[in-house]
């Protein structure tokens, strides 16, 4: 089966927006227009199409599907058919991980801004992540019909806040309730959409009151295009006009290189401008073949690349897992190279496992289509994969490659959860397992002692949302404990002789174990080490493993506050035994007593997790942010200027002081600062803090 659409006519894009900028309406309108134009040859009344639009709104497919495929021939129907895959990017960036995972598989992004609110904090965060993955983008200023809409003010905000380089390619005709259409600065024509949901439109002359502003921005557009090459620049400087073709080609080249961002406008709600934005996606966004080959490593860890080509060996990245009520688990994949056919076996190098693809489905706006194969550049969902988690590679078993992994941080905060009823018990286990598969930054374990289920994640909000999803998606009601920090204990002093005795001899078979241990602190991160230094058989060989077992058990509960003990070296160097009464149990108990006895004398201390915190903030708030971090026992380690303005402040702060930080930071910076936090290392807690921790545990 050959390709239906050549890969050069593919566009894999994300539509990214602050919560209120109108992303859903924009996406729905895209699906509506592409749906209509795809079926343009069929005779049907508008009602049928609109029906599915209403139904879409009820079913919310645009919102739930991680990737939707649609087709576009241009608003005048003059393009060859292009295939546009829209990857959903979350509107809420409390989970930067979600945005990162979509940015990782996109080739280009449409940034939607509200014509009134402009560039909001959330937009800044998404912009930084797009910078990190070098994603080409264009800007669509939506809601031009709102009171207070101001297109050129949003342009200025993009320059000031994002340090973007927007190139205006459309000027709005009117604004607020007078918004009628746009002027296309490449064609220098006005475009007015009809009232039939914007399906038809007419070209006209530029309104007289806009001539000056259109000429000014047309000049800037041509200048931006001329900078694409020396040849064009010379032509421009010699006063030659650049053709429409030359301008488009140059703007495309510079957009894909990340040097400029074409800027458009419209009102999705009023059916104006979305069609021209789709044209811009086709004209200025990259095809999979326009971006560099993807990097990975082979089985010997040697670097390899995979080109976007059907003839290469198959490689893909699983970027999202979803549970579908009809087909079970869907694994959304982006194919980077080669072809995948239904029934093929794929290899997952991260887990070292082969799995078979049951079915492959592609989501279209109003239906899902089963397909037999997917090729380089495609995005689809696979059914039948059981072992894959987000961010893992799938590849041809005969040509193993591991694509660059998304990095998921270690969890640092935990909470106990317990089901409210017996009926919730079983469902909770299934729910937590599913959620952990979908989100690699979330972990589940069972507390040995209390038997409680402990969930661990990246922060308070993360765990709140997990508990909320258990209730919404799996119907599990759970009670949640208070967030807990994972403290540790260690020792600071060497104790030469720590004696442990376990003796029970009162008639009949007794118990007798006796050990003398030496305890020494190890350097941080070295872990636990056990040394057998018994001479002359004072402790028989067969009991030595029991002594080590006892010490390991004692390590699980420190003497200060019962936290696990780390970085200790224990040497067994003396002891005694009884021919009849000694046994493994007795020596294990003796070792536990000996270790606890020694630990008390060895200057025990509490260790707390230290977090590397990085705050990105507009300059005005930098002083307050630094002061606040210091008040949280933070060590500010440096402040850098950010590409794109603002300051990046790096600090090391104890995790226990970071609870509630997102709320404080939000109010301190009016929502404009963002922060990331990841575990760095354990450090000794100051005495007053340690005393408070011990007192809290003693309650």
Curated annotation (Swiss-Prot):
Residues 8-289 form the tr-type G domain. GO terms for biological process: ribosome disassembly. One of its GO terms (cellular component) is cytoplasm. Pfam families: EFG_C, EFG_III, EFG_IV, GTP_EFTU, GTP_EFTU_D2. Keywords: Cytoplasm, Elongation factor, GTP-binding, Nucleotide-binding, Protein biosynthesis. It is found in: Cytoplasm. GTP binds at residues 17-24, 88-92, 142-145. One of its GO terms (molecular function) is GTP binding. Its main location: cytoplasm. Belongs to the TRAFAC class translation factor GTPase superfamily. Classic translation factor GTPase family. EF-G/EF-2 subfamily. HAMAP family: EF_G_EF_2_B. PANTHER family: RIBOSOME-RELEASING FACTOR 2, MITOCHONDRIAL, TRANSLATION ELONGATION FACTOR G-RELATED. Catalyzes the GTP-dependent ribosomal translocation step during translation elongation. During this step, the ribosome changes from the pre-translocational (PRE) to the post-translocational (POST) state as the newly formed A-site-bound peptidyl-tRNA and P-site-bound deacylated tRNA move to the P and E sites, respectively. Catalyzes the coordinated movement of the two tRNA molecules, the mRNA and conformational changes in the ribosome. This is Elongation factor G.
């Amino acid at each position: 089966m050959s390709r239906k659409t050549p890969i050069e006519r593919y566009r894999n894009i994300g539509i990214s927006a602050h919560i209120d900028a109108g992303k859903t309406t924009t996406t729905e309108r895209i699906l509506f227009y592409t749906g209509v134009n795809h079926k343009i040859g069929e005779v049907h009344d508008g009602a049928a199409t609109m029906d599915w639009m209403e139904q879409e709104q009820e079913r919310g497919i645009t919102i739930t599907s991680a990737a939707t495929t649609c087709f576009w021939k241009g608003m005048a129907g003059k393009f060859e058919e292009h295939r546009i895959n829209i990857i959903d990017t979350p509107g809420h960036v409390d989970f930067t991980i979600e945005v990162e995972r979509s940015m990782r598989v996109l080739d280009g992004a449409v940034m939607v801004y509200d014509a009134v609110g402009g560039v909001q904090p959330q937009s800044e965060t998404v912009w930084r992540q797009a910078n990190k993955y070098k994603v080409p983008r264009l800007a669509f200023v939506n809601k031009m019909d709102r009171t207070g809409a101001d297109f050129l003010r949003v342009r200025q905000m993009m320059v000031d806040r994002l340090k973007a380089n927007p190139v205006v390619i459309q000027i709005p005709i009117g604004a607020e309730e007078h918004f009628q259409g746009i002027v296309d600065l490449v064609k220098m024509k006005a475009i007015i959409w009809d009232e039939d949901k914007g399906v038809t439109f007419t070209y006209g002359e530029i309104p007289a009151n806009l001539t000056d502003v259109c000429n000014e921005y047309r000049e800037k557009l041509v200048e931006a295009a001329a900078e694409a090459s020396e040849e064009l620049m010379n032509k421009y400087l010699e006063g030659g006009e650049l053709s429409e073709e030359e301008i488009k080609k140059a703007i495309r080249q510079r957009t894909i290189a990340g040097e400029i961002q074409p800027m458009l406008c419209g009102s999705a709600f009023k059916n104006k401008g979305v069609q021209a934005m789709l044209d811009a996606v086709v004209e200025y966004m990259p095809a999979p073949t326009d971006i560099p080959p993807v990097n990975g490593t082979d089985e010997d860890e040697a670097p390899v690349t995979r080109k976007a080509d059907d003839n290469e060996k198959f490689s893909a990245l699983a970027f999202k897992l979803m549970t579908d009520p009809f087909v079970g688990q869907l694994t959304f994949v982006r194919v980077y190279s080669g072809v995948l056919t239904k029934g093929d076996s794929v290899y997952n190098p991260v887990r070292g496992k082969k799995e078979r693809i049951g079915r492959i489905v592609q989501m279209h706006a109003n239906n899902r289509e089963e397909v037999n194969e997917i090729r380089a550049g495609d995005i689809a969902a696979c059914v039948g994969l059981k072992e894959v988690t987000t961010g893992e590679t799938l590849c041809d078993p005969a040509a193993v490659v591991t694509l660059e992994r998304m990095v998921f941080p270690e969890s640092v905060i935990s909470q106990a959860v317990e089901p409210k009823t017996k009926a919730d018990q079983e469902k909770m286990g299934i729910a937590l397992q599913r959620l952990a598969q979908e989100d690699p930054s979330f972990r589940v374990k069972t507390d040995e002692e209390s038997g409680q289920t402990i969930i661990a994640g990246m922060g308070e909000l993360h765990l709140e949302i997990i508990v909320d999803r258990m209730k919404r998606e799996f119907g599990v009601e759970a009670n949640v404990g208070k967030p807990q920090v994972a403290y540790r204990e260690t020792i600071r002093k060497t104790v030469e002789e720590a004696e442990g005795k376990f003796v029970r001899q009162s008639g009949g078979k007794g118990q007798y174990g006796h050990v003398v241990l030496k305890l020494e602190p190890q350097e941080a991160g070295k872990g636990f080490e056990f040394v057998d230094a018994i001479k002359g058989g004072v402790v028989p060989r067969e009991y030595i493993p029991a002594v080590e077992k006892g010490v390991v058990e004692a390590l699980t509960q420190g003497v200060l506050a019962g936290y696990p003990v780390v970085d200790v070296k224990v040497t067994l160097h003396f002891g005694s035994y009884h021919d009849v009464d000694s046994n493994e149990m007795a020596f294990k108990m003796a070792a536990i007593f000996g270790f606890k006895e020694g630990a008390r004398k060895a200057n025990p201390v509490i260790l707390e997790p230290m977090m590397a915190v990085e705050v990105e903030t507009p300059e005005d708030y930098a002083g307050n942010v630094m002061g606040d971090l210091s008040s949280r026992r933070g060590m500010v380690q440096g402040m850098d200027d950010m590409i794109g303005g603002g300051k990046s402040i790096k600090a090391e702060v104890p995790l226990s002081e970071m609870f509630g930080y997102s709320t404080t930071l939000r109010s301190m910076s009016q929502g404009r600062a963002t922060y990331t936090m990841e575990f760095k290392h354990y450090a000794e807690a100051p005495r007053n803090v340690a005393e408070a921790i011990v007192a809290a545990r003693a309650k």
